[in-house]
């Protein structure tokens, strides 16, 4: 029987993501204990983060951005679990987020301020470096006090530019409309369905992920397997 590879494609670290509440080292330990074979570190890549770093050069900013990923990778080298590079990308046009992986560190240095580019230009750039693009939590809602209700702030604006989207998102701090998610899967059958924990806090551990057959390294192999829809199972909590 071919080995199964249990992978969470949506993990944040406190070193890089301001909303992250778990260090990269601890995240690796927790996922190893939970029986995962690998995680993709997808810290937030957006204008607000890079502006917060002040007047550093772009290369220095990327070194800061990669701290969570690099720390996690060093920790994973002590055991058997694998850590891969990804980003959760957002540009200045909207609040939509996208999981992007399949490129290596060099792309982040060579292509500055991708958040300032149009979605079309940024996605074309990602693909030039072999990356896959999956929309994160496309139908998420947040509570707005002035309206006294939950309002959707994330939408699938560019389905024709996507490889797939998060059908399951394990982070229950937010509301995602399952009816809209299912409707999108039916409307766009060519899009690959994935699952991610959206890990920020220990309570999010192992609430999402995918299972592939085989053993994967480097990240380009994972991107190719997902692109070819070789996912065997979507991991999700009973609450999803």
Where do the model's predicted regions map?
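Charged catalytic cores and adjacent phosphate/nucleic-acid-binding surfaces used
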Residues: 1-17, 21-29, 93-107, 124-125, ...
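Aromatic-lined carbohydrate-recognition surfaces of secreted/lumenal glycan-active proteins
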Residues: 131-145
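Helix C-cap/helix->beta junction micro-motif
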Residues: 79, 129, 188-189
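An N-terminally biased module of ancient metal coordination in phosphate/nucleic-acid-related enzymes
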Residues: 1-91, 192, 200-203, 234
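Conserved beta-strand positions in the central sheet of alpha/beta enzyme cores
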Residues: 40-41, 134-135, 166
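Glycine-rich tight-turn/loop motif centered on a GG-T
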Residues: 58-59, 106-112
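Catalytic beta/alpha-barrel core
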Residues: 109-116, 168
């Amino acid at each position: 029987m071919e080995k199964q590879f249990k992978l969470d494609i949506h993990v944040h670290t406190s070193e890089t993501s301001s909303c992250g509440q778990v260090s990269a080292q601890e995240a690796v330990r927790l996922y190893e204990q939970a029986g995962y074979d690998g995680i993709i570190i997808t810290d937030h890549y957006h204008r607000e983060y890079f502006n917060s770093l002040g007047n550093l050069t772009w290369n220095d900013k990327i070194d800061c951005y990669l701290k969570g990923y690099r720390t996690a990778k060093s920790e994973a080298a002590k055991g058997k679990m694998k850590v891969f590079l990804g980003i959760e990308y957002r540009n200045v046009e909207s609040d939509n987020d996208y999981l992007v992986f399949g490129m290596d560190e060099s792309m982040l240095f060579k292509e500055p301020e991708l958040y300032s580019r149009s979605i079309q230009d940024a996605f074309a750039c990602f693909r030039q470096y072999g990356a896959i693009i999956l929309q994160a939590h496309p139908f998420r809602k947040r509570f707005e006090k002035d309206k006294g209700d939950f309002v959707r702030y994330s939408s699938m604006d560019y389905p024709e530019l996507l490889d797939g989207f998060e059908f399951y998102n394990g982070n229950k701090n937010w509301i995602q409309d399952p009816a809209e998610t299912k409707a999108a899967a039916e409307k766009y059958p060519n899009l690959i369905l994935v699952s991610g924990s959206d890990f920020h806090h220990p309570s999010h551990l192992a609430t999402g992920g995918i299972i592939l057959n085989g053993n994967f390294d480097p990240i380009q192999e994972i991107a190719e397997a997902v692109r070819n829809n070789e996912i065997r199972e979507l991991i999700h909590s009973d609450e999803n």
